[in-house]
Amino acid sequence: MRISLKKSGMLKLGLSLVAMTVAASVQAKTLVYCSEGSPEGFNPQLFTSGTTYDASSVPLYNRLVEFKIGTTEVIPGLAEKWEVSEDGKTYTFHLRKGVKWHDNKEFKPTRELNADDVVFSFDRQKNAQNPYHKVSGGSYEYFEGMGLPELISEVKKVDDNTVQFVLTRPEAPFLADLAMDFASILSKEYADAMMKAGTPEKLDLNPIGTGPFQLQQYQKDSRIRYKAFDGYWGTKPQIDTLVFSITPDASVRYAKLQKNECQVMPYPNPADIARMKQDKSINLMEMPGLNVGYLSYNVQKKPLDDVKVRQALTYAVNKDAIIKAVYQGAGVSAKNLIPPTMWGYNDDVQDYTYDPEKAKALLKEAGLEKGFSIDLWAMPVQRPYNPNARRMAEMIQADWAKVGVQAKIVTYEWGEYLKRAKDGEHQTVMMGWTGDNGDPDNFFATLFSCAASEQGSNYSKWCYKPFEDLIQPARATDDHNKRVELYKQAQVVMHDQAPALIIAHSTVFEPVRKEVKGYVVDPLGKHHFENVSIE
C-alpha cells in the first residue's frame, strides 16, 4: 500500500502527538497520601480536626501570614508586610498583588485577591448578621472559643490592597493566631455568586482558594484528588497530582506504603515502628509532638461537678501502664496540658500518682463509696496524640472498675463524635490537641477557657474564674516573663481542679517512602506537600 507524502506527514504528526502525550503522562508526578479519615468539610473556619485541615486549609487555602513549614515561625503569606501600632491594638496588613483564585464548573473568578475577601472571611465568623454566618451550621469553634468576637473590634478595608484589624486590647499571640487554619481567606466574589444562585453552602463544599493545589474530585471515605494550581502565587508544586487515599486502618496504610500504593502515611501503629525502622524502602521521620492526649470530665454532669470525684478518677488510672501498652515507647506521661518542650512549662507540678486507695477515699468523701456508673467516650480514629483510643478506653475502664466505677465505652463516627461532644452529651470524652501556633495560649484558652466552654473546644465545659484570671492577663501582655509566670500558676490551678485526666505527650512518627524528597515533619501536625518531589 502506498501512502502519499501528505498522508505520510499527517501520520508522522499524529504519531508525534501521541508520543508527546505518552511522554507527558509518564513525566506527570503523582503523590498518594494515605490519610486516616474523611474531612468534615472543606471550609476550615467551620471545623477543628487535623484531618479536615490536611484536606482543606493546607492544600487549598492561604492566610495573611503563614507558619514556615516545619517551624512555628510566622512568615508573610497573602500579606507581604504588616505594621503594628504602638499600643498593640491596630494591625495593618498590605496584601500581595497578583494572587489568583482557583475556579470550578460553577464559578470563574473575574478578579484577583483583594481586601474584600479578607474582610468577608472574618466578618462571616464574627458578625451574626452576615448572610453567611449561619450557612453550613454556622459553628466557628476556634474563632469563638478563642474569644475573637470580643477581641476584634473591627476588620476594615483601607483600600483594595490594605486591611486593618482593630482590637479591643493588646493580644500577644494575635499574629500567630492569624496563621491558624480558621483564618484562611475565602473568596467574597464566589460567596456572593453562590448566595445569588441560592446555593450558599457550595462555598464550603466545593472550595475555591488561593493555595498550591485545587480540588478536582472528592469521594467520601474513598479518595480526594487535587491538581497543582497553575496560577499559584508562590513556588509551583513539584508534583502534578496529589491524591488522598482515605485509609482509616493503620495496618492497611502501612501495607499500602510497602506496596508503593501510597508514598506518605500518618499515625503508624506503635507496634509497627520497629519494623519500619528496618524497612529499607522507608524513611521513618520523627519529632517530639507539640501535643497532648487527655480525657475530659464534663463538669456540668453529676457527679463530675465535684472536684473530689474528678481527682478520684484521675488517681485511679495507671498512666504508666497506658504509656507502655498504647504508646509502646512513642510517648511520655503528661502532668500538664502543655508539653515539656513548650515555653512556660511548670515542671514543679507533681503528677497524680496511680493510687487506687486514695481514689476510694476521695469517692467516700464525695458520698460515693458504693461507686457509680459513667460513660467513657473513645475516639474512633487514630490521632498523633492517641494511637489506640479503644485500647486506652478499655484500660481506663478496667482501672475505674477496681474502685467501683462502672464505665460504658461509647463511640461514634469521627464527625458525629465531635459534634455530639461539642453539644456536651458525654460524661467523659477522649480528646487531644496538637498545637496550632507554638503559644501556650493555644492550649489553655482554646481548650479550657470560659469562652471555649460555650462555643469552642472546651469539652470539660469547665469555666473557673481563678484559672480565667490567669490565662486572660497572660494573653494580653507582651511581657514574656510575666506570661511565663502566669501560665505556670495556671498549670497549678488546673492540676488541683482536675477538669481532665491529662494522659500523654506523644512522639510523632511519619513513615515516608525514600522516593519522596523534601517532605518535612510539621510540629503543628499538618501534612504539607507543596514542596515535595518524587524521584
Swiss-Prot record:
Identify the domain of life.
Bacteria
Keywords attached to this Swiss-Prot or TrEMBL record, sorted alphabetically, are:
Chemotaxis, Disulfide bond, Peptide transport, Periplasm, Protein transport, Signal, Transport
Q: Which GO terms describe its molecular function?
A: dipeptide transmembrane transporter activity; heme binding; peptide binding; peptide transmembrane transporter activity
Matching SUPFAM superfamilies: Periplasmic binding protein-like II
Q: Which cysteines are joined by disulfide bonds?
A: 34-262, 450-463
What job does the chain carry out? Part of the ABC transporter DppABCDF involved in dipeptide transport. Binds dipeptides and accepts a wide range of side chains, including small neutral, bulky hydrophobic, and positively and negatively charged groups. Tripeptides are poor substrates. DppA alone controls the specificity of the Dpp transporter. In addition, plays a role in chemotaxis toward peptides via interaction with the chemotaxis protein Tap. Binds heme. When a foreign outer membrane heme receptor is expressed in E.coli, DppABCDF can also transport heme and its precursor, 5-aminolevulinic acid (ALA), from the periplasm into the cytoplasm.
- Free-text comment on this protein's domains from its UniProt entry: Consists of two distinct domains (I and II) connected by two strands that presumably function as a hinge. Undergoes conformational change upon substrate binding.
The text of the family note is: Belongs to the bacterial solute-binding protein 5 family.
In its UniProt entry, what is this protein called? Dipeptide-binding protein
Give the organism, scientific name.
Answer: Escherichia coli (strain K12)
